[in-house]
């Protein structure tokens, strides 16, 4: 082997070996235990960033570790290639999204190879190709035929100037990002998949996911939002308002029913439209509400606004008349779009009632009998009913049941289960996505495109004007036939979450002449380890779980869930610096262009950019283009080698925590690999070592061998069960420090060092595979890619001797080395006769001797 560690040449050589030998190409093998490891596939944005590198390094470490456990490991990669950024880049660079996307894929593929990830490239695909989305289109038509797909009008962001629909991220402060025109909400027909049909199963099956972080499961439970309540009807005073006889509301707190003082309805509620017909002021308010898109999370903090409709509702039990208001905090797509308002016991209702001078009627008091005060805020806890007629004195559950029973008996309400989860809207009014395979004939009937006419291909040779989708602008593209009749194609495309909801399954049989080949899919699925960011908890991870159940019910897979174990890696942070420009805005400066001075504690005391300007340190924040604080992985690989970058990524922080990028840490990782290289080189230059003869080892040799096997046991557990990769690396580093100081003179010394170095190299292999490949060969072993993970020798862990601490009156006076099986009497005799101990006990009476087996002897004397 070469004397100096030269990662660049070495890594190229090893990567060529993997490519030439198709090392990571796998197929189904019923005689081998399978392991499917998957990192969330990348969007081909142009260049890898450090977040990608962290995600894919974790996946590669897990894959290679499992490979050395003797498993049949599949680790595929592909490209989540549709989406809005490609459209924006195409407009900016005067090209079409397709060539921009394919160029990026080629560049990023090369970057992934340079990092040494062990992917089965035979399974690679990009979701923007017809070979992929054709099966998605066909599956969608099957769902339509099963009644799981429907079309209804739904609200979108509309720019009246550009006459186009905007994605949420294209709306900035309520205006179009391109022309700054105020954005309106517009109702247009869109396609939906009935995920709500699976809401209960999606909720229940979270309990099966023992390998998922609790936090992600909690987020999904909240997103699905199952609640038990009562759907009840308030009659309208004028017995019938244009065909509406009553007003349905849903409540989870029927115990508060006697405290209702008004009813709130959403701006999109049919009654609101009726009430506004002869009321221009109300019509204007409704329009304002519709054009103010409110996220559910903002409802609690936003200003509550409303307007009376002039309609009156009648309380279903006590007959009291209550006004009906349009309120901006009532959402049309939750429950019935109407709420019974109980200001004394709901904070939003309280704020609204206070603002508009509506009655506040308390009907619940604390169980403990403490005083009830609703003058400043609502009392929202569950308690005991009062001023509620026959229900007085009942606590929550009893009141819930009694009031629900009375409403049911009178035909005015029913107990019901509600879900916060809404059906999945899959229509996007964009170009760069998979065309939705539906057509409309001249009689207005909608039909799925027949399977023999699929795929509906998205034209790639287009001109982007940045406003209208090319397939909407090209009237000829939409023209087609259905059963010989003229028809028009759907010009919306699928939400890109569609492609990412089943890609994990396509990897099992990427060339299959169907969405999946069941026998292959059922060999590999479910995914054993999935790795990705927690920001995908409620969308991608939920849609994938849903899609898996759809595939199961269509007979393609037998499992209920797609991902057995989930690891959510933390973000990568870096220093960020800025200066204020003439307009008072922040100009962000790349950290590589900043010279910093630090005090003794490492805090930044001064920072200047390359032009000598003072810049402000904004702290360690997430690497991003907007803050200009991303570090190019390519530069780091060119400078230090892929193994060093991988080692730093896995060592600098626990995998699920944020990682602070420090180049000094990268340098430290590089120094460590040089030390490993040097020690192996020194050892192998002296020739081959013999086999270990455990019986012939000295005490020191046994102790060193024990350290080696303890390290193997710890590293195995840290990588496999605990997934604390950083502590595994720390243990290897600690062992290396001992090996560097270990004697190498005798044959037995060299034997132990040989065993230890082979263990170190094998344990480093998942993390730093290139250097490990080379050092393994230098140590006389063949092909580390197919080697076995080191196993620890239980006998080597057994200690022949133990060190006992001896205290006199609680103070350390001696340390004894005794046989591991020494009795209490033997230890006491040795301790009491120890030369140093007797100095402190001479002339004293020994009152008590306390022995903690294998650890401590405490002598009490006075």
Curated annotation (Swiss-Prot):
UniProt main location, coarse: cytoplasm
E.C. code: 6.1.1.4
CC per GO annotation: cytosol
Pfam families attached to this UniProt entry: Anticodon_1, tRNA-synt_1, tRNA-synt_1_2, tRNA-synt_1g
A molecular function (GO) term: aminoacyl-tRNA deacylase activity
Motif 'KMSKS' region per record, residues: 622-626
Record carries keyword Protein transport: no
InterPro entries given in the database record: aa-tRNA-synth_I_CS, aa-tRNA-synth_Ia, Leu-tRNA-ligase, Leu_tRNA-synth_edit, M/V/L/I-tRNA-synth_anticd-bd, Methionyl/Leucyl_tRNA_Synth, Rossmann-like_a/b/a_fold, tRNAsynth_Ia_anticodon-bd
Keywords: Aminoacyl-tRNA synthetase, ATP-binding, Cytoplasm, Ligase, Nucleotide-binding, Protein biosynthesis
CDD domains in alphabetical order: Anticodon_Ia_Leu_BEm (cd07958), LeuRS_core (cd00812)
Gene3D superfamilies referenced in this protein's UniProt entry, alphabetically: 2.20.28.290, 3.10.20.590, HUPs, Isoleucyl-tRNA Synthetase, Domain 1, Valyl/Leucyl/Isoleucyl-tRNA synthetase, editing domain
Record's subcellular location: Cytoplasm
Reactions this protein catalyses: tRNA(Leu) + L-leucine + ATP = L-leucyl-tRNA(Leu) + AMP + diphosphate
Chain positions recorded as ATP binding sites: 625
GO annotation terms (biological process): leucyl-tRNA aminoacylation
Endpoints of the signal sequence: none
Motif ('HIGH' region): 42-52
Family affiliation: Belongs to the class-I aminoacyl-tRNA synthetase family.
Name of the protein in question: Leucine--tRNA ligase
UniProt source species: Vibrio campbellii (strain ATCC BAA-1116)
Gene responsible for this protein: leuS
């Amino acid at each position: 082997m070469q004397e100096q560690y030269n990662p660049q040449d070495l890594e190229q050589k090893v990567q060529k070996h993997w490519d030439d030998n198709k090392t990571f190409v796998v197929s189904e093998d019923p005689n081998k235990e399978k392991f499917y490891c998957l990192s969330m596939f990348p969007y081909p944005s142009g260049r890898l960033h450090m977040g990608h590198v962290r995600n894919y390094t974790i996946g590669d470490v897990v894959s290679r570790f499992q490979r050395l456990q003797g498993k049949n490991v599949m680790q595929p990669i592909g490209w989540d290639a549709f989406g809005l950024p490609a459209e924006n880049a195409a407009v900016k660079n005067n090209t079409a999204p397709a060539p921009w996307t394919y160029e990026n894929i080629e560049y990023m593929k090369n970057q992934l190879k340079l990092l040494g990830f062990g992917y089965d490239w035979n399974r690679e695909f990009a979701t923007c190709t017809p070979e992929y989305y054709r099966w998605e289109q066909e599956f969608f038509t099957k769902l339509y035929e099963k009644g799981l797909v429907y079309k209804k009008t739904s609200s979108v962001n509309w720019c009246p100037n550009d006459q186009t629909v905007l994605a949420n991220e294209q709306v900035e402060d309520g205006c179009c990002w391109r022309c700054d025109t105020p954005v309106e909400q517009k109702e247009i027909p869109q396609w939906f998949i009935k995920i709500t049909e699976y809401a209960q199963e999606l909720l229940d099956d979270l309990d099966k996911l023992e390998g998922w972080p609790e936090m992600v499961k909690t987020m999904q439970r909240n997103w699905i939002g199952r609640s038990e309540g009562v759907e009840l009807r308030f009659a309208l005073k004028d017995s019938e308002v244009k065909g509406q006889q009553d007003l349905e509301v849903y409540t989870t707190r029927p115990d508060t029913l006697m405290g209702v003082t008004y009813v709130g309805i959403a701006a999109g509620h049919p009654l609101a439209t009726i009430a506004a017909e002869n009321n221009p002021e109300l019509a204007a308010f409704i329009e304002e509400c519709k054009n103010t898109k409110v996220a559910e999370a903002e409802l609690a903090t936003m200003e509550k606004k409303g307007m009376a409709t002039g309609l009156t509702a009648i309380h279903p039990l006590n007959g009291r008349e209550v006004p009906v208001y349009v309120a901006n905090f009532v959402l049309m797509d939750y429950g019935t779009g109407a709420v019974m308002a109980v200001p004394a016991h709901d904070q939003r209702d309280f704020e609204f009632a206070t603002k508009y001078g509506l009655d506040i009627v308390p009907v619940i008091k604390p169980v403990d009998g403490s005083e009830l005060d609703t003058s400043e805020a609502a009392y929202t806890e569950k308690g005991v009913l009062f001023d509620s007629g026959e229900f007085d004195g009942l606590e929550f559950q009893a009141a819930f049941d009694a009031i629900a029973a009375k409403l049911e008996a009178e035909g005015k309400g029913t107990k019901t289960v509600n879900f916060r989860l809404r059906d999945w809207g899959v229509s996007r009014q964009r170009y760069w996505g998979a065309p939705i395979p539906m057509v409309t004939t001249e009689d207005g009937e909608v039909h799925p495109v027949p399977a023999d006419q699929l795929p509906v291909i998205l034209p790639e040779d287009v001109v982007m004007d940045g406003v209208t989708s090319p397939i909407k602008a090209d009237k000829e593209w939409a023209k087609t036939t259905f059963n010989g009749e003229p028809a028009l194609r759907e010009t919306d495309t699928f939400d890109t979450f569609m492609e990412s909801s089943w890609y994990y399954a396509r990897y099992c049989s990427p060339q299959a002449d169907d969405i999946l080949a069941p026998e292959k899919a059922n060999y590999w699925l479910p995914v054993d380890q999935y790795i990705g960011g927690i920001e995908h908890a409620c969308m991608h991870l939920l849609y994938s779980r849903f899609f898996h159940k759809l595939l199961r019910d269509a007979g393609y897979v037998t499992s209920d869930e797609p991902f057995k174990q989930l690891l959510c890696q933390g973000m990568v942070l870096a220093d960020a610096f800025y200066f204020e420009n003439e307009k008072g805005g922040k100009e962000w400066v790349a950290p590589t262009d900043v010279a910093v001075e630090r005090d003794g504690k490492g805090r930044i005391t001064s920072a200047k950019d390359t032009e000598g300007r003072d810049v402000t340190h904004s702290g360690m924040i997430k690497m991003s283009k907007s803050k200009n604080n991303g570090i190019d992985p390519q530069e780091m690989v060119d400078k230090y080698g892929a193994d060093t970058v991988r080692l730093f990524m896995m060592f600098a922080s626990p995998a699920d925590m944020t990682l602070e990028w420090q180049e000094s840490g990268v340098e430290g990782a590089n120094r460590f690999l040089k030390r490993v290289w040097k020690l192996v080189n020194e050892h192998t230059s002296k020739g081959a070592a013999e086999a270990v003869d455990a019986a012939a080892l000295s005490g020191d040799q046994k102790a060193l061998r024990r350290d080696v096997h303890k390290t193997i046991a710890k590293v195995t557990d840290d990588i496999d069960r605990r997934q604390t990769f950083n502590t595994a690396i720390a243990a290897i580093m600690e062992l290396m420090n001992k090996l560097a100081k270990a004697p190498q003179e005798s044959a037995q010394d060299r034997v132990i060092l040989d065993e230890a170095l082979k263990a170190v190299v094998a344990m480093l292999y998942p993390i730093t595979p290139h250097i490990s490949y080379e050092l393994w060969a230098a140590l006389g072993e063949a092909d580390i890619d197919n080697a076995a993970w080191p196993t620890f020798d239980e006998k080597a862990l057994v200690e022949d001797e133990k060190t006992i601490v001896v205290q006199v009156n609680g103070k350390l006076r001696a340390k004894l080395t005794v046989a591991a099986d020494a009795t209490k009497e033997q230890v006491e005799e040795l301790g009491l006769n120890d030369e140093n101990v007797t100095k402190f006990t001479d002339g004293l009476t020994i009152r008590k001797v306390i022995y903690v087996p294998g650890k401590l002897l405490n002598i009490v004397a006075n």
